[in-house]
Structure formats: C-alpha cells, structure tokens
C-alpha cells in the first residue's frame, strides 16, 4: 500500500510537470542557465515557453513563485517519507538536485545567501528535528526542549550550509565521492549516537 501511494504521488507530480505549469517551469530553468535570475522577466518566461503573460500569472505570482514550485515538485516532493533514515533523506536531496544541477547551481550563485537560507531552512529544520528526537534518549530530561532546539538549530545550519556550499563550490557534482563522504559521516558519527542511545535503553 505504501509503494502504491508513492507511485500514485509520483504520477500526479509527473502530470503537473507535463502540463502548462511544467512547460513554463522548463522554460524558466532554461533561462536561468542562460542568464542571471535577476535579469529574467515574466515576458522572457512567457516567450520561452510559447505562452502569454496572462498564462503565467494564472499559475504563478512572480518568478520567485515558479522557482519555489520547481523545487517543491522536483526535489522536496520526491524526498523519502519521515519514517526513512535521515541518511536516505539527505542522500536523496542531493540525488534529486543532480537532475538539474546546472540550474540549481546558477540559482544559488545568483541569489543572496540569506535568500537561499530562508527558503530552505524550514525544510531542513523539520527533518533535522526528527533526527535529533530520534537520537535523544530518556536520560535527557533536564531542559530537554532547550537542548533539542539547540541541537536542531546547530545541525540544521550544518547540513543546510553544507548543501548550499557544496553546490556553489562545485561546477559538477561528483555523486560517487559525495556518497562515500556522506556514508563515512553517517556511519562513524550518527550511527555511534544511535548505538549509544540503544545501549542506554538496554541498561534500564
């Protein structure tokens, strides 16, 4: 049933990308790869997609709206469910970004660091909080919420900063080397935290 629902969701998202909004999204991505985000106009997007400005405003408020929609459809919506390990989520984030790496890299280089961070922070913060909650054991009871909030903010900045900086600093993504690095990070550090939590639970 889980896989059936996932397949249905992917088909729905695919239909969205093949429709009018999808055509404008593809045109927008092409434009971003050719010129800076700041210089792209709604007329440019309409012309590139063989649509009208009216078509654009029927579906989107502005170019920031279409930018957010593309990320939501092609990256965020395709991420693993919350029940899956954080490692899988973070890996999938890069994997989904790979499909249009040049586009995302141009965006990150065109926009300010604060714009990118504010756009992506909620997505990262929510998923990192689940990771932190998974790692905290029952021995952490004094100021538990404060410690959870602190840890979430720390690791959100770490993972989000790495994601942004990696794309900005690498003209091409070496996915194999990235996977090796991430596997080492998660196996040597996160797995240790989880094992410690499990051992703590067994001793009770």
Q: Could you tell me what each predicted segment is?
A:
Residues 146-168, 173-189:
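Hydrophobic alpha-helical segments that form the core
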Residues 79-109, 113:
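Hydrophobic alpha-helical connector segments
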Residues 2-35, 39, 44:
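Basic, helix-initiating cap at the start of DNA-binding domains
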């Amino acid at each position: 049933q889980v896989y059936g629902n996932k397949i249905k969701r992917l088909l729905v998202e695919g239909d969205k990308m093949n429709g009018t909004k999808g055509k404008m999204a593809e045109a927008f991505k092409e434009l971003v790869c050719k010129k800076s985000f700041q210089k792209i106009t709604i007329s440019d997007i309409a012309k590139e997609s063989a649509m009208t400005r009216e078509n654009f405003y029927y579906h989107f408020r502005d170019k920031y709206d279409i930018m957010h929609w593309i990320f939501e459809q092609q990256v965020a919506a395709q991420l693993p469910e919350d029940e899956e390990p954080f490692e899988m989520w973070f890996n999938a984030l890069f994997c989904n970004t790979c499909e249009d790496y040049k586009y995302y890299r141009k965006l990150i280089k065109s926009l300010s660091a604060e714009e990118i961070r504010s756009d992506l922070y909620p997505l990262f913060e929510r998923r990192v909080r689940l990771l932190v909650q998974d790692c905290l054991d029952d021995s952490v009871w004094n100021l538990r919420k404060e410690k959870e909030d602190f840890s979430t903010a720390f690791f959100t900045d770490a993972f989000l900063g790495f994601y942004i900086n990696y794309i900005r600093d690498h003209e091409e993504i070496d996915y194999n080397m990235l996977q090796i690095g991430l596997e080492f990070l998660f196996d040597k550090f996160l797995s240790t935290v989880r094992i410690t939590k499990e051992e703590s639970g067994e001793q009770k």
